[in-house]
């Protein structure tokens, strides 16, 4: 039997365009997990994270694309790449007879949206940041729906068909997870989880390294996800301590956050969605070089829901960070109140909402 998507009885065919960082890839994976009966293929860029995360799950197609920042010559080269990539994606969409495209933004979204638009293939774009990216602002009007992680984003997208859904996280964040056996943390002992994001966070790691001795002396456990590129940073080393546990990366973040009293984290949209879903209060230290300072804006949205505080990455804020953590350790009732506010603010399962939207858009486009 022919299972191509143009047969109404066949499996729907979805092309996912998500590349680069965990903030783009993990939400798309979370949605894909909700569509087990769909035929899904992936569009990415060579030598990026999707090569490790996606290849064993879905067929992976790659086009050469880069960002728009840089010199006028680089921008001209990026435009040439965009033209070539759009033609490549157009051929892929035609040969694969895809029903619909899902993209989570970033520069890979541009050729995916333009190619789909030229063929009349519907597109669902998810924008997780408060300040939408350039591609979302430029091309969102070509998408059937722009799904938003935060309600505040809509004001930056006039004339776009936007719908607030939250940011998808993996299924394990919605159900209680067993705590990892390799971390012998006694019940009742306070746990701080430090998350630098999928690309690591040298400045955050160094701030934590400076302040952690005081927190350990106060009785806290620290599970520190340093990021692979940061693990050997000599300026981010904390003296060996039985309650300090550094790891470049762990797959059981859901279990860690469900057990944590609070977290110290970058403010990427994916990390914030995981914190919100698990109702984990957080001290947020945004990545200072994020495009258009979008992590700081993301952090303000999280803090506005009553879930923590935000501070800039700076040596001047070392005392503030040290004392804020000590205060939270000494006042667990305040932390519990923040957790309750986050629990009340958590949106429905965004992965399921987006999966349902994909089904609705496909069905309406097939009529």
Curated annotation (Swiss-Prot):
EC number from the UniProt entry: 2.4.1.227
Top-level class of the enzyme under EC nomenclature: transferase
Alphabetized UniProt keyword annotations: Cell cycle, Cell division, Cell inner membrane, Cell membrane, Cell shape, Cell wall biogenesis/degradation, Glycosyltransferase, Membrane, Peptidoglycan synthesis, Transferase
Protein localization: Cell inner membrane
NCBIfam families with a match to the protein in the record: murG (TIGR01133)
Name assigned to this protein: UDP-N-acetylglucosamine--N-acetylmuramyl-(pentapeptide) pyrophosphoryl-undecaprenol N-acetylglucosamine transferase
GO cellular component terms given for this protein: plasma membrane
Molecular functions (GO terms): UDP-N-acetyl-D-glucosamine:N-acetylmuramoyl-L-alanyl-D-glutamyl-meso-2,6-diaminopimelyl-D-alanyl-D-alanine-diphosphoundecaprenol 4-beta-N-acetylglucosaminlytransferase activity; undecaprenyldiphospho-muramoylpentapeptide beta-N-acetylglucosaminyltransferase activity
Lineage: superkingdom: Bacteria
């Amino acid at each position: 039997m022919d299972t191509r998507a143009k047969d109404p009885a066949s499996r729907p065919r979805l092309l996912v365009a998500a590349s680069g960082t965990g903030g783009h890839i993990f939400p798309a994976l979370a949605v894909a997990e909700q569509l087990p009966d769909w035929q899904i293929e992936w569009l990415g860029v060579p030598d990026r994270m999707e090569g490790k995360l996606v290849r064993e799950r879905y067929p992976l197609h790659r086009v050469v694309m880069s960002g728009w920042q840089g010199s006028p010559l680089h921008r001209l080269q990026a435009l040439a790449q965009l033209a070539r990539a759009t033609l490549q994606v157009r051929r892929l969409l035609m040969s694969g007879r895809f029903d619909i495209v899902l993209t989570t933004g970033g520069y890979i979204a541009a050729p995916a949206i333009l190619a789909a638009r030229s063929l009349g293939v519907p597109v669902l774009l998810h924008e997780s940041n408060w300040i939408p990216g350039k591609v979302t602002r430029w091309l969102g009007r070509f998408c059937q729906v722009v799904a938003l992680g935060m309600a505040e984003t809509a004001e930056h997208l006039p004339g776009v068909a936007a719908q607030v859904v939250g940011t998808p996280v993996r299924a394990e964040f919605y159900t209680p997870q067993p705590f990892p056996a390799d971390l012998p943390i006694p019940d009742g002992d306070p746990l701080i989880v430090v998350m630098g994001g999928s690309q690591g966070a040298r400045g955050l790691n160094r701030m934590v390294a400076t302040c952690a001795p005081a927190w350990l002396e106060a009785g806290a456990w620290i599970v520190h996800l340093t990021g692979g590129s940061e693990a050997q940073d000599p300026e981010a080393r904390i003296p060996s301590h039985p309650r300090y546990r550094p790891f470049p990366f762990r797959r059981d973040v859901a279990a860690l956050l469900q057990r944590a009293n609070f977290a110290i984290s970058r403010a990427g949209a994916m990390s914030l969605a995981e914190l919100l879903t698990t109702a984990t209060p957080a001290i947020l230290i945004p990545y200072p070089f994020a495009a258009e300072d979008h992590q700081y804006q993301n952090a303000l949205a999280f803090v506005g829901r009553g879930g923590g505080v935000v501070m800039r990455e700076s040596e001047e804020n070392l005392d503030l960070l040290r004392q804020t953590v000590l205060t939270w350790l000494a006042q667990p009732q305040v932390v519990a109140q923040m957790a309750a506010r986050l629990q009340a603010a958590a949106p429905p399962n965004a992965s399921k909402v987006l999966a349902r939207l994909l089904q609705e858009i496909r069905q309406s486009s097939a009529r």
